[in-house]
């Protein structure tokens, strides 16, 4: 299944140490369900939970490499941790998530971007020298997620 926040925090700390030790890159995707509050208001919290479970399954399907990690970050926010993935690789995974979620075709009549549930994705790809802490990479991904939302949602922002 999908990891919780505590497990994510511990894996992320270790991956940052490993990245610095081996001088590799690390990509982190932050995802947020578009118009999720409206979804809950219309379809109810049980359907909201079901929607998040389906998204969780999509995220697990899209993280194929053994070191990749899909985690619930909080609310309707999720994180994909992709050790040693460059920006291009991270983008490929983000596009795969959006494609697989579209195929789930979860109805969302109050979305202004599509008739089904969509996500916005912020990507942070860093090298050892770029960050000091887990908070640093999360902050970058969060800023890019905010940018994806301000660009009209249902999109990916990586710089």
Regions found by a protein language model. Give the residues of each.
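Hanks-type protein kinase catalytic core
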Residues: 66
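A structural signal for short, well-ordered beta-strand segments
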Residues: 28-31, 78, 119-123
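Conserved long alpha-helical elements within nucleotide-processing catalytic cores of c-di-GMP signaling
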Residues: 1-27, 37-60, 71-75, 79-80, ...
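Catalytic-core segments of nucleotide cyclases and related cyclic-nucleotide turnover enzymes
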Residues: 87-95, 125-159
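Short, hydrophobic secondary-structure boundary micro-motifs
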Residues: 28, 109-110, 156-159
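Catalytic core regions of nucleotide second-messenger enzymes
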Residues: 99-119
């Amino acid at each position: 299944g999908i990891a919780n926040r505590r497990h994510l925090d511990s894996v992320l700390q270790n991956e940052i140490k490993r990245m610095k030790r081996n001088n590799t890159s690390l990509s982190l995707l932050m995802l947020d369900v578009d118009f999720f509050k409206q979804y809950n208001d219309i379809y109810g919290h049980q359907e909201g939970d079901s929607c998040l479970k389906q998204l969780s399954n999509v995220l697990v399907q899209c993280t194929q490499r053994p070191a990749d990690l899909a985690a619930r970050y909080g609310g309707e926010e999720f994180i994909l941790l992709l050790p040693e993935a460059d920006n291009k690789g991270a983008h490929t995974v983000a596009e795969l998530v959006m494609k697989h979620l579209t195929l789930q075709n979860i109805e969302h009549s109050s979305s202004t971007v599509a008739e089904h549930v969509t996500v916005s994705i912020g990507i942070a790809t860093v090298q050892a020298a770029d960050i000091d802490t887990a908070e640093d990479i999360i902050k970058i991904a969060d800023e890019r997620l905010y940018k994806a939302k301000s660009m009209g949602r249902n999109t990916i922002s990586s710089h």
